Design a protein with these regions (language model features):
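Ligand-binding pockets and gating/stacking loops
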Residues: 1-199
Length: 199
């Protein structure tokens, strides 16, 4: 149960999010969890898949004999295998294929490139994408931080996303929601910031 980290909670592991922790704006960006390790080439991947399937079969036989039915995770393995070896998925995650002009339009920062990646994922059929943009907890120096960094990053990235979706004809069937979770006091504190409501 990972309520604070955006996990599936009571829904169960099958509804857990696929989290990309790598920064898409970093040089040589690749999503580790969908990248084929360089050491696994040729038939090695298929051999490993068959070995795992055989071991799983033995485990199910053992569980049946011990009258201890375990929850099968074969479907998860299969889903992961298809994702890693899918050319469509690999292409969607490869934002280096985007023209530099497009990448700059979104903003050459983590948030902007995550929005670009989100657009690419929706184009290949991913029904739900969440992009996180932290750094809004301004207890001090609120005006300068927002004016110089936080707001331009948000504005540039969101404007590029909306424009891109409209140009590609997908805006009409895409719901874009931009929200924050902070409830702030309207009063500016002595450090030129805003604090949380005290309950």
């Amino acid at each position: 149960q990972m309520s604070r980290s955006g996990g599936p909670n009571f829904l169960g592991a099958q509804y857990a999010p696929f989290i990309i922790s790598e920064n898409p704006d970093s040089k040589g960006f690749r999503v580790r969890d969908v990248s084929i390790p360089e050491s696994i080439v040729g038939d090695r991947a298929e051999n490993r898949r068959e070995l795992r399937a055989n071991l799983d079969r033995l485990q199910r036989i053992n569980d049946k004999i011990a009258n201890d039915p375990a929850v099968s995770i074969d479907g998860y393995y299969e889903q992961g295998y298809k994702l890693v070896y899918s050319e469509k998925a690999q292409a969607a995650f490869d934002i280096s294929k985007e023209p530099e002009e497009t990448r700059k339009k979104y903003g050459r920062n983590s948030f902007g490139q995550r929005l670009l990646l989100a657009r690419r994922l929706t184009e290949v059929g991913v029904p739900w994408v969440t992009v996180y943009n932290g750094g809004w907890d301004h207890h001090s120096n609120l005006f300068k931080t927002c004016k110089d960094k936080a707001l331009p990053t948000l504005d540039t990235g969101m404007a590029a996303l909306m424009e891109d979706l409209a140009e590609r004809g997908t805006l009409d069937n895409t719901l874009v929601v931009c929200l924050g979770e902070f409830g702030r006091t309207p009063k500016i504190n002595k450090n030129a910031g805003r604090d949380h409501w005290s309950f």
